[in-house]
Design a protein with these regions (language model features):
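Single conserved hydrophobic/aromatic residue that forms the stacking wall/gate
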Residues: 1-12
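A glycine-rich helix N-cap at a beta->alpha junction
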Residues: 13-48
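Short glycine/serine/threonine-rich phosphate/pyrophosphate-binding segments
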Residues: 6, 24-26, 114-125, 146-147, ...
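Active-site/ligand-binding loops adjacent to catalytic centers
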Residues: 54-83, 105, 130-133, 138-229, ...
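Glycine-rich beta-alpha junction loops
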Residues: 22, 47, 74-77, 115-119, ...
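Phosphate/pyrophosphate-binding loops at sites that engage ATP/ADP/AMP, CoA/4′-phosphopantetheine
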Residues: 97-106
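Buried hydrophobic positions in well-ordered alpha/beta secondary-structure cores of metabolic enzymes
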Residues: 33, 95, 111-112, 118, ...
Length: 279
């Protein structure tokens, strides 16, 4: 990614739209993008998060025919959700390859991935969608609780609607407007969901677990203590499914760790779970 980014910089100007709040929450990632030559433009409207960044990026794209629109999430108008899902499918391709080497079988019993807009889960699930023996579990962000009013559990409490050019599931207020999402995780606080995941959930092919901030934080410290791996806060939502679900001792469960947690250290160290870990 980095070498491609540098190469493109010789030909194209790169402008990255990012929610102003998310810039604060993901400062290390922002600094990396700047070092690679990108101009990071804060989205200052609305909740100042992913939803608003997509709004402003789409607006900039439509205003100038010389602009080329890229998005890393499986949301927006066709063909973007399908393109992103296919590009991300290298994840499930790699899962199959590694499982074959380690277990002699390509398919696990379960694949678990966190779910915001949907790129990570789309990639982890892609080559297993037509494998009915493989259970697909998406961990979406419940924030402070599904019924708290501060949540991003779109598939749990959302309804059908149109957002960013696609018909999908989204959270709405009493007037039918898009409702502001909340999650401690910057990558999961999106009020909608990719259309692929809306379809998988509606048809029953994908199961959904709503994971709170605290459950994700607890899972992050568990993995850090047990394996010495500090996961991204987004990935920690998927890890939390281990305690929320009952798995058999012989089940092969693949949990996709979508990123590292250095960007989330402030949230980790300020949480109540850090007290025991630091003593």
């Amino acid at each position: 990614d980095r070498s491609v980014s540098r190469g493109l910089g010789d030909v194209y100007k790169r402008q990255v739209y990012m929610g102003e709040l998310d810039i604060q929450r993901q400062r290390p990632n922002v600094e990396r993008m700047k070092m690679l030559g990108a101009k990071v433009i804060p989205a200052t409207s609305g909740s100042k998060t992913l939803n608003d960044a997509v709004n402003e990026a789409l607006e900039a794209w439509m205003k100038d025919p010389e602009n080329f629109y890229l998005i890393g999430s499986a949301v927006g108008p066709q063909p973007y959700p399908e393109m992103v899902s296919r590009f991300q499918s290298v994840i499930s391709e790699e899962i199959k390859k590694q499982l074959k080497e380690k277990t002699g079988k390509e398919n696990p019993d379960y694949v678990v991935a966190c779910l915001g807009g949907g790129s990570n889960a789309a990639g982890a699930f892609y080559h297993f969608i037509n494998e009915p023996s493989v259970h697909l579990i998406a961990a979406e962000a419940a924030g402070k609780g599904v019924d708290s009013g501060e949540t991003a559990a779109t598939l749990t409490i959302g309804e059908k609607g149109i957002l960013h050019g696609s018909q999908t599931m989204l959270m709405k207020d009493e007037q039918g407007n898009v409702k502001e999402a909340y999650s401690l995780s910057a990558g999961l606080d999106y009020p909608g969901i990719g259309p692929l995941h809306a379809h998988l959930a509606k048809t029953g092919r994908m199961e959904v677990e709503a994971v709170t901030d605290d459950e994700a934080l607890k899972a992050a410290f568990m993995l850090t203590r047990e394996e010495g791996i500090i996961p991204a806060l987004e990935s920690s939502h998927a890890l939390a499914v281990l305690e929320k679900r009952k798995f058999g001792k012989d089940d092969v469960v693949v949990i996709n760790i979508s990123g590292r947690g250095d960007k989330d250290l402030d949230n980790y160290l300020s949480s109540s779970f850090a007290q025991g870990a630091l003593e």
